Amino acid sequence: MRALVLLAVLLIAGCAERSAPGVTVLTYATPYAPTHPFSRADRDWMDWVERESGGRVRIVPFWSGSVLSSEHSMTELRHGLVDIGTITPIYARGGAHLHRAQSGFYGGTSTIPQQLALYRCMQAADPQFAKELQGLKVLAVQGGNLPGIVTRDRPVRRLEDLQGLRLRAPSELLSVLRHLGADPVDMPMSEVYSALAKGVLDGVVAPADTLRSLHFAEVARYFNAMGIPRGAYAARAMGERRWRSLDPELRQLLERSIEVWERALEVRILAAEEAGLRAGREHGIEFYQMPAEDVARFLKIYESDAEARARSLARFGIDALSTFRFARRIAAGLMETGEIDCTRSTNEPTA
């Protein structure tokens, strides 16, 4: 692994543009194509950094997984494969147990700013977050549109319609869907279009933006917009060693750029949802809403499952249960006041 990383670093160094005197060149890599909404937000951020630096910074992008992998991106950044990259700790196979579990702690949040605020509350309260991201400097936290249920041949009007459906779903929803009688699987989203087209999958738990961005409107017929809770996660980062090598003025610029990058992601993600809904209507997708009583039942199962997964991390020496309960207190306050309050008393009951 170390030899492969070293070889890749040398190859990238050869591909990166040579910098003029006084210009710092930073490399950026992502698994997404340059036309993906995430990549459009990345480009917005790059343009801002280069403009604000007065030409003292150039960012060289590597798109479409040409350099950085999805599964090992955090390790690759720590080794300096590239300077900055997209990371997905919620999908990491190991070493990010709390990040994976916390993605199911977001019941009650409905907007991207709420998702980011709750993530930062938990991050500030639990040092395990920083431990799992050791060796990285986080440059953006990302939330997302609330998923619905896309299906091929059978509409989902109520929870009982999930029975027997083979659905691709994120890991935090697998046991919830099994409880409801579905047959959920976890597979890369890049494989879902083909699986839907061939009938290997009956559907996928995904937000409306995928109707266009992943072309699901071409191979599906129904969308239930039930708004399943989803979490935020550290999504863009720089290797810590590279971060420390930068001059203080450039580090300050990149610190200021965090808000810019997160806002660009939010704007592009929301625009993608509108585009997805339009694409769905153009392709004749039938849209449904889940009845309120079914949503309440789903959220109860979702919360119970999240608590069970938090308890299970005790075997790794991680007290995720305290973080789960903290998140539930914050969510209860959100329901009462409409605001995320990280200081909500630990003596208050959970929702």
Model-inferred region functions:
Residues 15-115, 131-132, 136-351:
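N-terminal secretory/targeting leader peptides
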Residues 120-134:
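Hinge/lid segment of periplasmic solute-binding proteins
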Residues 3-13:
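Bacterial N-terminal signal peptides
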